[in-house]
Amino acid sequence: MVASFDDPTLEAFRHASGHSVSTSAAVGETRNLVILSRLGLDRLASPKSQGLQIPVAKYGYALDFPRLVHSAHQRNMAIHYWTINDPAEMQRLIRLGADGLITDRPDIMRETLRRLGYPEIETPER
């Protein structure tokens, strides 16, 4: 999945790739889906991307609410939150339905997943 914060850059990439590569929503597309979801008008959203990669909050507004996760999933979009380093926050977002978490602490993530009953992940040797 290719991601960029810049809408024109992402749109140029989509065009250059013939829309054959999955992309994450840029700022404008993310903002539209978040606002429409908050207003209960998410049925009007028609994002071009296959995912959201977002923080849990921005400018004091929560982005980790159930309707946004549901709206993304209804559109076959993955939703990834960044940067999550706290085990309780990891657990909460997994239970919310996040498809991925970006973390600086894979050791904590691994232990959190183990505690939630996920199968052990083998670490490749270096």
Task: List each language-model region with its residue ranges.
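Short loop-to-alpha-helix "cap/lid" segments that border enzyme active sites
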Residues: 1-99, 103-126
